[in-house]
Amino acid sequence: TATSTVTLTERYLTPKDFQVNLELCKADFEQDWLAIEQGFSSFDEVPKSFANYLIGHVASKVASKMEQTIWTGADGNAGEFDGLVVLALADADVIDVAGVSAGAGGIDASNIIAELGKVVDAIPATIYGNEGLSIYISQADARSYVRAQATLGYKDLYHVGQTEMDFEGIKLFVANGLVSGTIVAGEKDNLMFGTSLQSDMNEVRILDLANVDGSQNVRVIMRFSATVNYAIGAELVLYQLSA
């Protein structure tokens, strides 16, 4: 016989469909790419290495945008879904930390240590000390932290060498999708990225239109779906600048 109750809640991953459809002209690349691959020639077939280059180029652009969307995306914006920061702002369970005033200049090397201290103080006991716990910071705030460590004379190296991205035993993870003044702390297992199929994020097609319409164009097509969420809001800390 049960002597207590358990309340269950659910959070969903609902992937959003995206598509990339670019059309490029091979003539723009002939002098600096095709000439290297096949010598001076009037043949316009796309060499395999050029196709690989296009795939890598487009994939890197998509990855950069996806990184930003994962953290600060908004579903109302074209090509985005609600990112982790937007979801956390709407969740009363998430632990909010008011940071230094944006009007005072936000985070810099002079206050980054104190502001990270506020984040650590807010981390709940249920996850503090866990191996998967990380503090996610922007690239700009990471630079401020490195400079602050140098000023403090890290390992007597000062401005020489590389600073460990660690704060009071907690790993600092540089998330390029975050903006300066926004910091997230939580376990990596609490953060979820989902697609409709495991292979969705690496499907790219190259279509050479020379055999279709006789043009010198190449079409790069990518279709995928993605979204993010977290499991337990009460085990997530969100730091933002004060007004």
What feature does the model see in each segment?
Residues T1-I36:
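Assembly/oligomerization interface modules of large self-assembling protein complexes
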Residues Q19, I55, N130-G132, N217:
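Extracellular structured ligand-interaction cores
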Residues C25, F29-D32, I36, I137-D141, ...:
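Helix N-cap / beta->alpha transition motif
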Residues W33-D121, Q240-A243:
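Alpha-helical scaffold segments that mediate packing/assembly in large oligomeric complexes
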Residues A59, A63, E67, Q139, ...:
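Internal mixed-charge
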Residues A88-S110, S144-A243:
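Sequence/fold signature of self-assembling virion shell proteins
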Residues I113-T151:
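Ordered core of a single globular domain
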